């Protein structure tokens, strides 16, 4: 990364699994994740809070901005990366596909609630099934998203304003 970025905008970095080396296409080693965070800080990038994303996007200045997102709510995020982000209060969005919550390898609703209590942490909808929705009809897509919304309301007490399309 360089301090001389000409283009204005917000860089979005997406992560999935942490220290789950048997999934190389979606995994990052913690030593590399920590290098990412340190490099971002060293180059004076600003971590964007999701609540301010729209105003940051509409009000582009010369500051270099980054939004971190984490997909799928794998337990490895909670165990490995969450303590680092929490300690540094680095803002991010955790996108949750709700059907898998509590399943083997995934976070629980209690863990997600714990994270959601932090002002810098946001929980987003990643659908219910995490299916490749392009292959579904409008009714199936609507039903899938509505199931996730119901899970959010039941377990967190609100419907998230953030949505990340599975495989999108």
Locations of regions flagged by a protein language model:
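N-terminal pre-catalytic segment of deacetylase/amide-hydrolase enzymes
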Residues: 1-66
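Metal-dependent polysaccharide deacetylase catalytic core of the NodB/CE4 family, i.e.
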Residues: 8, 13-19, 63-66, 75-78, ...
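Short, solvent-exposed loop/turn and secondary-structure capping segments
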Residues: 25, 79-80
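Glycine-rich, phosphate-binding/catalytic loops in enzymes
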Residues: 29, 84-87
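Distinct, well-ordered alpha-helical segments
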Residues: 55-59, 81-82, 112
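Noncatalytic alpha-helical scaffolds and linker/capping helices
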Residues: 71-73
């Amino acid at each position: 990364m360089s301090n001389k970025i000409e283009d204005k905008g917000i860089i979005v970095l997406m992560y999935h699994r942490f220290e789950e080396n048997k999934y190389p296409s979606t995994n990052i080693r913690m030593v590399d994740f920590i290098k990412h965070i340190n490099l971002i800080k060293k180059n004076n990038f600003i971590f964007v809070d999701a609540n301010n994303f729209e105003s940051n996007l509409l009000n582009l200045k010369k500051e270099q901005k980054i939004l971190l997102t984490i997909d799928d709510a794998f337990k490895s995020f909670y165990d490995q990366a969450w303590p680092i982000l929490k300690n540094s209060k680095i803002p991010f969005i955790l996108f949750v596909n709700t059907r898998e919550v509590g399943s083997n390898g995934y976070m629980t609703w209690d863990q997600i609630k714990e994270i959601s209590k932090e002002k810098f942490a946001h929980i987003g909808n990643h659908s219910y099934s995490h299916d490749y929705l392009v292959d579904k009809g409008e009714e199936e897509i609507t039903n899938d998203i509505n199931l996730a919304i119901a899970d959010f309301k039941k377990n967190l007490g609100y419907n998230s304003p953030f949505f990340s399309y599975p495989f999108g």
